[in-house]
Amino acid sequence: MAIVSSITNHSSLPNDKGEERLVGPSLLREELKLSQQDSLRPKSFDDFVGQSELKKVLEISVKASLKRGEALDHLMLYGPPGLGKTTMALVIAEELGVKARVTSAPALERPRDIVGLLINMQPRELIFVDEIHRLNRISQELLYPAMEDRRLDLTVGKGTSSRMRSIEIPPFTLVGATTKPAALSSPMRDRFGITQRLDFYNYLDLENIIKRSAKLINLVISEEASQQLAKRCRGTPRIANRLIRRVRDYAEVYSHSKKIDVEVVNDALDLHRVDQRGLDATDRSYIGLLVNQYQGGPVGLETLAAGLGEDSTTLETVVEPYLMQIGFLQRTSRGRVVTPAAKKHYLLTSPNNIDK
């Protein structure tokens, strides 16, 4: 099924001021080039590994809409980045047998962007809007009648001579993806008939994703190697696929082979400074500052940001969530505190207590 992509000005673009993180959840520049034609993306519910409850809900909804010959209800997918929201939207389009138009909220800043997207649709088409929480108020208000009543309400003319004109549009499905569902206006949230969360993946699902991806790029990976990779990818398929590509590069250059064993995985990821819990140099610097200079905390966020030379928002939204997820960090009213598990891991992986 053809995919029409209009992704521009995407916030998943890496920050030009900072270094791209191999284990960061945002898309890297090289991954943006792969776009929706990424060969590792599943094309059906059967190919999509993990998220079993979500898949069951969506399979029922898709089959029911096909049986009735109607457009699928508008769908909101939310959760941390890299878990497959875009992929799931494309899978749904394939299962429905319709075209998917892929865009993002920053590309829909002007009313004419929304109008141009909606008036050129075919019946039952799927429109995927990434970062939908970033839509401005005018764009959201244009979508209200489109989602609920299948019409566009446009203002024609200016001043006292202006008048409202309504244009009927075909039935369609809007799939909105967001990491911040609470940032959407209440009227916008209410217009989604289906709202589902994507969760972090367990090790078994990640192993299966890694094995599937390895097969698609003609690698032979051992059981132990896939297990080791699964431990390092932070519960995130996007990171799993990114790491397996880096391991492939290493194997082709140093082993001259497409066979991946655990030694190759360890050597490749040690080279990239990704340890056995998926922590990179940035994570270890954060923990190291707390352990070495502040005896584990509590320490204020701004103090940590100054000590690391990082923006406090970056620390709060990019670095800290995973450390909290694995039980290495606590946010308290007095500041940030590392846990005993974090101290133990840091001392084991950084013998000199410094990771510059």
Swiss-Prot record:
Positions bound to ATP: 40-41, 82, 85-87, 191, 201, 238
Binding site for Mg(2+): 86
Domain of life: Bacteria
Compartments, as annotated in UniProt: Cytoplasm
Disordered: annotated span: 1-20
Annotated region (Small ATPAse domain (RuvB-S)), positions in chain: 202-273
GO terms for MF: ATP binding; ATP hydrolysis activity; four-way junction DNA binding; four-way junction helicase activity
The protein's role, per its UniProt record: The RuvA-RuvB-RuvC complex processes Holliday junction (HJ) DNA during genetic recombination and DNA repair, while the RuvA-RuvB complex plays an important role in the rescue of blocked DNA replication forks via replication fork reversal (RFR). RuvA specifically binds to HJ cruciform DNA, conferring on it an open structure. The RuvB hexamer acts as an ATP-dependent pump, pulling dsDNA into and through the RuvAB complex. RuvB forms 2 homohexamers on either side of HJ DNA bound by 1 or 2 RuvA tetramers; 4 subunits per hexamer contact DNA at a time.
Domain notes: Has 3 domains, the large (RuvB-L) and small ATPase (RuvB-S) domains and the C-terminal head (RuvB-H) domain. The head domain binds DNA, while the ATPase domains jointly bind ATP, ADP or are empty depending on the state of the subunit in the translocation cycle. During a single DNA translocation step the structure of each domain remains the same, but their relative positions change.
Family assignment from sequence similarity: Belongs to the RuvB family.
Subunit structure comment from the entry: Homohexamer. Forms an RuvA(8)-RuvB(12)-Holliday junction (HJ) complex. HJ DNA is sandwiched between 2 RuvA tetramers; dsDNA enters through RuvA and exits via RuvB. An RuvB hexamer assembles on each DNA strand where it exits the tetramer. Each RuvB hexamer is contacted by two RuvA subunits (via domain III) on 2 adjacent RuvB subunits; this complex drives branch migration. In the full resolvosome a probable DNA-RuvA(4)-RuvB(12)-RuvC(2) complex forms which resolves the HJ.
Protein name, UniProt field: Holliday junction branch migration complex subunit RuvB
